[in-house]
Structures are given as structure tokens and as C-alpha cells.
């Protein structure tokens, strides 16, 4: 990256840094220094005079007040060439700042430093009817971003001590970057994510944009403006051209990998769990490889990535012919590689739409959402897979897609390939394709991975065996998986032999000084998995297989499968925010917080790895959830990110986890318009995993079709005359706590046992089925009435009193309460099986 562009991006990232530095003192001592002056002094004192100018002059009124002699002074403090064009660079950042978020001017008139970051979820409305309940205005506590379980609070104000704590830590680490000559945009971005994700960008009443997202989007827009005007940047004053918001200066690049469902789930049941995780992880790094290649070729930074994960990505870029040509090349090269490796099972749809500066106000062009525009283009490409290659080399597509003799079938993915490799598992030899062979080895090592290196070269990684785990080829690079990064001696050895490249650090925002010559990228992954005993002597513990997991269930030895995602996600982004609030910074905040929940919070809830106040808050949030065991740990997160997840485990633990996660999501968003739906299914351990995933997906669709904000636990019986198969989360928990919870207790071994005769359980289930078959008749009611009368001496008063409520028909309510017991009692019936 050339220096002028790098200064522009760094200037944009740091232009509002004074907001972190002056608010603590303003709260504690009432001292009112402007954020511009605070940022200017901080950067100047670190001998960064050019960057200090961006902190001081990023508002239009200040720039228009500058005189020609001021710009001559800039040339003296700037590097050769950069100081000469600083006027244009300052105007670029000023314009980017305005386009990123238009709320800036209000803070100058209404400075309230103790105001916290309001949850952006509080601004989402209009997704469901207003009857769902009021939207709470809550705020996130000021804290570092990382592996923490954060819930918004009511009536919260930021203290001066909290600001000074963040300020002190940020200053210390930023100074280290300067001292180590590591002041690269991506490292600064990583530092800002850690310390400013929960700092409000403004301190006005509705300050729901984080400082991090505002700085990140300002840098993204600034880089686009610089590259769009690059040919003129040294020719004179470009103020009017920079401020022209009608010109189509920007591109929204969208990427979507199709064939994901087939790639992940179409595998044999043998060793399926290990393959599922490694395949979903493989797709994560495939997306990262493509995204990194795009931003490298376009001379952008990770600031320009709006979202990447789950097989999708969006990037903001300058609208130039070179950029559009590079997008076409990346699409062709990636698809040629995917065709060769996967025979057409995976395909990259990659395209872009142009927009102007005014579109950033509400992320629309001509009244249509930019998301809709780009997704339409991607949909067109997916209907014409490999059209670019077919037009030039049709025989290549035909041959790779299987129209060729002498191919063998991979024992795992069942794909016809030219060559298979033998992999030994105990006494068994399995014939697998090249990709499955790499994923085979990766599956066992996933829990150990601390990071990976993306490089164009292979390097000499095996010279550091204590760090090397695996190497996998991607379309544009090699990914080398490494461990031991917490040990300085291993990091030093790695630096001696590693080629140039990018280092992805898993679930951490730490920047190790040994990595100063690398681009360092945080990658948050929900990868919790219950451990099992290694199959061979001397092996470390590995992920349990499905047979072992099933045996750890409460009651029936079965496997549970859970599919879950956010309801109406497209509506939330396109219509959930009021038109005047659909700024790119707010959209970025919304997207990042959802991804945080599915990457970080899911991992913490699944593992229970929280302590102190976080543990107390989690216990409070999940207090009313169905509970079959105190320690729920036998689950494996196969995939979680963006807005959805797929979890496998002991059926009882997965069942419990589903409700706990829904409760956490509800406590995280505090908005009845933002909900989750889920499909849950139970199977024998030998049942093909891809079929169980399909059934869970069907149940998820059932939950959505019946109104959303629901969980579907069982297929609706054909004999049922009640067309409702899914349960609202709160309704299920109410029924569980009101009726089911009084029917069982847990013994010393953690197993569930009935506190009533099992015949009682079956009788209620029978009545529920009878009602479902003939809801207009009351035979079931009469039957229960006489049954309760006969059983008064055999059933405790507490239980009988609860269940006698079923005898009170609610004329205007359908279905009746007896029907709501059907699925909860089926769950209990499984829990007491031996």
C-alpha cells in the first residue's frame, strides 16, 4: 500500500480517537477539551504529526477555515509527497466521516460523556406486529471486546473510571505499535476493535453506533474516495470533486458460495462428526482466502469488509474499471479451482453494484436496498454456474463434473474423483479424495488450532514440529494451521522460518510483538466440542464420536441435532431501521453484534466457560429454561456464525442448550422484533448425519412457517387435526415449569426419575393425542376427570392440583392446554428411559 493511501486510512481510523481520551476526564473533573484537540495532542506527542492533523481537521468548518500558509506548514511535517497533498487527504477523511454517520453535529451541542452505547437492536422495529411487546432502550456496558458474555443493561451510565481504564490500556498498546514500527491499518483496526467496540461514537441521546464501527466505515469510505480520485490526487485542489455525492464512486461487492449444504452434509455416517466440523471450518477459511485475495488486489484493507462468514461476504470498494476487472478475474480463477477440486459441487457467485455517496444515507439506490440489488445479481450468477468457463472451455466443465470414465468414488463424500488416497483408521482402510484426506487429519486437530498463516509460499513449517498442525491448499494461497502461539519461544522460532503472509489468531485480539512483519487478523470461531477419550494409546483427548455422545444422554441413548437461525434477517437489515437511520455505520454495528453473538456468545454458553459476574448473569438469564441436568456439556458446535448455527450432541444436552441460547439471545437483543427459530430432532447414533440435518432443517422451516419465534421438536402427526407443530419458546417453558417440572427429580448420578407412576405420564400423553385427533370432542376430558378422581390417593396433592387445571376448558382458545403438553411430555418420556 502506497504511503499516501496508508496515511489516509490511518488518518480515518484515528480521526476521532480523542473521544476515548477526553470523556473520562470530562466526567471526573468536568474538564471540557474537544475530542479534536485531545486526539491531536495524543498523536503529536507520539511523533505522528501528520496523523495528528487528521484528528484536528476532520470537520468541514475547520477545514474551510484553513489558510494557504497552514497547508505550507503541512508540507514541513509530512513525509515527502504526502505533505503536498494533505489538503486533499484531509477533505477525503472529512467527507468519509460525514458519509459514515450524519449524527456528528449534534454532539457539539449536546455533550454528555456519561451516556453509554445504546444497543442498536433498540432501533429495530416494524418486523412483527406491535402486539409482540414494547422495545426496551438498553445500553451496553463499557468494556473491552473479546471472549466475554455481554448483556445490555437498563439505566446504565458510564463512569469516568471506566473510560480511564479503557484509555490507559489503549494508550499503552498503541504506543507499543508505534515503538515497534507496527502502525499498519489492520493492526490499528484490531486494537480499535478491542477497546472501542462499546464506546459510543456520539454522546447524544440515541447514540447507538459504536466508535469502532464509525472509525472502520470512515476508513473504508476514505480508501474508496482516495482510489477513485487517485489519478487526480496530486494535480491540485479536489474539494468539489471529493464532495460530489451524485457521482457513482462506490461498489458494493457481494460474494456467495453455493453448494454449502451439499458439501457439508452429504457425507457417510462413519466418522461424520469429525468431518462435519472440519468441513464447516474449511468453508470459513475458503471465504477468508477469497476475501483476502480481493482486498489485496484492490489495495484495500479489512476496514472495507462489511461482513464475511457463513459462505457469504460483502466488501465496499471504489467504482473503477480496474476494480471491476479484478472482480471478474477473481471469480474466474476461484471457480476454475473449485471446479477442479469439487467437480462443480461448490461455486462462487461474485459480482458488484455501483452506488453514490447519497446512497450511504440509507443504503439504497433509487428506492431499493443495496442488499437486494447485489443479492439479485448473485442469484442470477448462481442460476448460470460456471458460465464464464463454459464460454471459453466447455470441455473442462463437462470433464470435471463427472462426464469421464475411470473415476473412483470417495468413501466419505461419495464424489467421483480421478484419484483416491488410502487412510487407515484402526484396522480399517478408507479410500478418500484429496480434500477429504486433508480434512480427515484436520478434524482431530481442530481443538488444538490457535491460528493459521495464509501465505503464497509453503515455507519450512515442519522445522517447528511443536507448532505445525496441518497445511491446506486454497484457491489463492496455502493455510498453515499452527498451535503454541501463547509461548514466546515458539513464536520466535516461527518468525525465523515463516514466509511472508497474514496470521489469523483464533478467538483473540492480542497482537504479539513477534508478528510485526505480518498482517494480524482476529478470527472468532464458535468451536466448542465435548472431548472424548483418544482411540489409540498415547493420543491426546479428541472430540467424542456420536456413539459415545449418545451414551452420555439423560435417559434414552440418542443423539440430538439442532438447527437455529434469526427470523426475518433480510427485513431487519432492509426495513428494520428507520429510513433516516440506515447509515452504513449503524448497519455495520448491527451486523457485527449479530456475528458476535453467534461466534463468541454461542461458544461461551455452550462451554459454560464464564466466571464471576458473567456466570451470575448467565444463571439468571437461563433460570426458567427446561433443565434435565445441572451440568450440560455434551454438545459439539458444528457451525455457528452470522445468523445461524448447527449443533449435535447428547439429545438431552442439545435440548437444554436450545432454550438456554434462545434466552441469552433474547436478553442480548431485548427486542421482541428480533427472534430465533429452531428445529430439533433426535436420532440413533448410527442414523446418517446428513439425513438428521435435513430433518432438523425441515423442522426449522416448520417453526418459521407457523409464525416464527418457535421451536419445532417433533413432526406433526398425520392423524392430528391441529395444524400446529411448533411451540413458542415462552409457551413451551411455561408449560414445562407449570406441569412437567413437578413430575420428575434428579438422582445422585444426574439421571432423571419420575416422581409419579409412569402410567400417569402415559395417560396425559394419551389424552393429548385424543384431543389432537378429535379436537371438537371432549372424550379426553371426561376420561381425565374420572382418572384424576381414582388417582387422588396415589398422586401427590401438588401434582394433582397442577394437572386438574387441564379440566378447565378455555372456550375461545385453540388449541386447548392439553395439546400444549404433548411435546414437553414426550421429552420427559425420553429422559426417564433406561
Label every PLM stretch briefly:
Residues 1-140, 145, 151, 199-203, ...:
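Divalent metal-dependent catalytic cores for phosphoryl transfer on phosphate-bearing substrates
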Residues 1-10, 20, 29-49, 71-79, ...:
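Alpha-helical phosphate/pyrophosphate-handling elements in metalloenzyme active cores
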Residues 58, 251, 301-316, 343-362, ...:
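A short glycine-enriched loop-to-beta-strand structural element that forms part of the catalytic core
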Residues 338-348, 374-389, 668-672, 694-720, ...:
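Catalytic/regulatory signature loops of cyclic-dinucleotide turnover enzymes
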Amino acid at each position: 500500500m502506497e504511503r499516501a493511501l496508508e496515511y489516509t486510512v490511518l488518518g480515518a481510523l484515528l480521526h476521532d480517537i480523542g473521544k476515548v481520551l477526553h470523556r473520562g476526564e470530562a466526567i471526573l473533573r468536568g474538564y471540557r477539551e474537544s475530542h479534536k484537540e485531545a486526539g491531536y495532542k495524543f498523536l503529536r506527542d507520539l511523533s505522528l504529526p501528520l496523523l495528528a492533523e487528521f484528528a484536528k481537521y476532520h470537520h468541514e468548518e475547520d477545514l474551510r477555515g484553513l489558510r494557504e500558509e497552514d497547508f505550507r506548514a503541512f508540507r514541513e511535517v509530512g513525509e515527502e509527497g504526502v505533505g503536498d497533498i494533505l489538503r486533499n487527504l484531509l477533505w477525503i477523511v472529512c467527507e468519509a466521516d460525514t458519509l459514515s454517520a450524519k449524527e456528528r453535529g449534534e454532539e457539539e451541542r449536546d455533550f454528555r460523556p456519561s451516556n453509554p452505547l445504546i444497543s442498536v437492536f433498540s432501533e429495530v422495529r416494524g418486523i412483527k406486529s406491535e402486539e409482540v411487546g414494547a422495545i426496551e432502550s438498553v445500553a451496553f456496558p463499557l468494556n473491552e471486546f473479546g471472549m466475554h458474555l455481554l448483556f445490555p443493561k437498563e439505566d446504565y451510565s458510564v463512569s469516568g473510571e471506566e473510560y480511564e481504564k479503557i484509555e490507559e490500556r489503549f494508550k499503552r498498546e498503541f504506543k507499543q505499535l508505534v515503538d515497534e514500527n507496527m502502525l499498519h491499518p489492520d493492526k490499528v483496526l484490531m486494537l480499535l476493535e478491542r477497546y472501542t467496540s462499546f464506546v459510543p461514537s456520539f454522546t447524544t441521546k440515541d447514540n447507538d453506533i459504536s466508535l469502532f464501527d464509525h472509525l472502520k466505515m470512515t476508513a473504508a469510505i476514505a480508501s474508496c474516495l482516495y482510489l477513485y480520485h487517485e489519478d487526480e490526487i496530486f494535480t491540485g485542489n479536489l474539494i468539489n470533486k471529493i464532495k460530489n455525492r451524485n457521482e457513482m464512486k462506490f461498489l458494493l461487492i457481494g460474494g456467495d458460495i453455493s453448494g454449502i449444504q451439499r458439501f457439508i452434509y452429504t457425507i457417510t455416517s462413519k466418522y461424520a462428526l469429525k468431518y462435519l466440523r472440519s468441513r464447516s471450518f474449511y468453508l470459513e477459511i475458503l471465504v477468508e482466502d477469497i476475501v483476502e485475495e480481493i482486498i489485496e488486489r484492490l489495495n484495500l484493507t479489512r476496514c472495507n469488509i462489511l461482513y464475511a462468514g457463513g459462505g457469504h461476504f460483502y466488501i465496499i470498494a471504489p467504482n473503477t474499471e480496474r476494480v471491476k476487472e479484478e472482480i471478474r478475474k477473481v471469480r474466474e480463477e476461484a471457480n476454475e479451482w473449485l471446479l477442479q477440486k469439487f467437480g462443480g459441487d461448490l461455486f462462487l457467485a461474485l459480482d458488484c453494484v455501483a452506488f453514490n455517496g447519497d446512497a450511504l444515507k440509507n443504503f439504497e439506490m433509487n428506492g431499493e436496498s443495496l442488499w437486494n440489488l447485489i443479492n439479485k445479481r448473485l442469484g442470477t450468477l448462481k442460476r448460470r454456474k460456471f458460465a464464464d468457463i463454459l464460454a471459453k472451455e466447455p470441455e473442462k466443465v463437462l470433464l470435471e463434473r463427472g462426464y469421464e470414465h475411470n473415476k473412483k468414488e470417495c468413501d466419505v463424500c461419495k464424489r467421483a474423483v480421478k484419484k483416491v488416497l488410502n487412510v487407515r483408521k484402526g484396522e480399517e482402510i478408507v479410500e478418500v479424495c484429496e480434500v477429504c484426506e486433508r480434512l480427515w487429519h484436520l478434524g482431530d486437530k481442530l481443538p488444538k488450532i490457535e491460528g493459521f498463516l495464509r501465505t503464497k509460499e509453503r515455507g519450512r513449517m515442519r522445522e517447528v514440529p511443536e507448532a505445525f498442525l496441518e497445511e491446506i491448499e486454497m484457491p489463492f494461497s496455502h493455510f498453515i494451521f499452527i498451535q503454541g502461539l501463547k509461548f514466546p519461544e515458539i513464536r520466535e522460532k516461527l518468525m525465523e522460518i515463516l514466509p511472508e503472509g497474514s496470521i489469523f489468531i483464533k478467538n483473540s485480539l492480542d497482537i504479539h510483538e513477534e508478528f510485526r512483519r505480518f498482517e494480524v487478523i482476529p478470527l472468532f470461531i464458535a468451536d466448542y466440542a465435548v472431548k472424548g477419550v483418544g482411540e489409540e494409546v498415547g493420543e491426546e483427548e479428541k472430540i467424542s464420536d456420536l456413539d459415545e455422545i449418545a451414551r452420555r444422554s439423560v435417559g434414552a441413548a440418542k443423539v440430538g441435532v439442532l438447527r437455529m437461525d434469526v427470523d426475518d434477517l433480510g427485513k431487519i437489515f432492509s426495513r428494520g431501521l428507520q429510513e433516516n437511520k440506515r447509515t452504513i455505520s449503524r448497519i455495520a454495528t448491527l451486523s457485527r453484534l449479530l456475528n458476535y453473538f453467534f461466534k463468541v456468545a454461542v461458544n461461551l454458553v455452550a462451554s459454560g466457560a464464564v466466571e464471576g459476574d458473567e456466570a451470575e448473569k448467565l444463571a439468571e438469564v437461563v433460570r426458567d429454561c427446561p433443565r434435565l441436568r445441572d451440568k450440560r456439556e455434551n454438545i459439539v458446535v458444528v457451525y455457528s456464525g452470522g445468523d445461524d448455527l448447527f449443533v449435535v450432541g447428547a439429545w438431552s444436552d442439545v435440548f437444554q442448550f436450545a432454550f438456554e441460547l434462545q434466552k441469552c439471545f433474547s436478553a442480548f437483543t431485548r427486542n421482541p422484533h428480533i427472534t430465533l427459530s429452531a428445529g430439533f430432532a433426535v436420532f440413533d447414533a448410527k442414523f446418517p448425519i446428513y439425513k438428521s440435518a435435513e430433518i432438523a432443517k425441515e423442522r426449522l422451516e416448520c417453526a418459521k412457517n407457523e409464525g416464527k419465534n418457535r421451536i419445532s421438536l417433533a413432526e406433526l402427526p398425520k392423524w392430528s387435526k391441529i395444524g400446529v407443530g411448533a411451540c413458542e419458546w415462552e409457551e413451551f417453558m411455561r408449560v414445562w415449569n407449570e406441569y412437567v417440572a413437578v413430575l420428575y427429580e434428579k438422582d445422585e448420578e444426574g439421571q432423571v426419575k419420575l416422581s409419579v407412576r409412569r402410567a400417569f405420564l402415559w395417560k396425559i400423553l394419551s389424552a393429548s393425542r385424543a384431543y389432537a385427533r378429535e379436537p371438537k370432542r371432549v372424550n379426553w376430558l371426561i376420561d381425565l376427570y374420572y382418572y384424576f378422581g381414582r388417582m387422588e390417593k396415589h398422586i401427590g396433592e401438588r401434582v394433582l392440583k397442577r394437572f386438574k387445571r387441564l379440566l378447565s376448558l378455555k372456550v375461545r382458545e385453540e388449541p386447548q392446554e392439553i395439546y400444549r403438553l404433548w411435546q414437553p411430555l414426550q421429552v420427559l418420556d425420553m429422559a426417564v428411559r433406561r
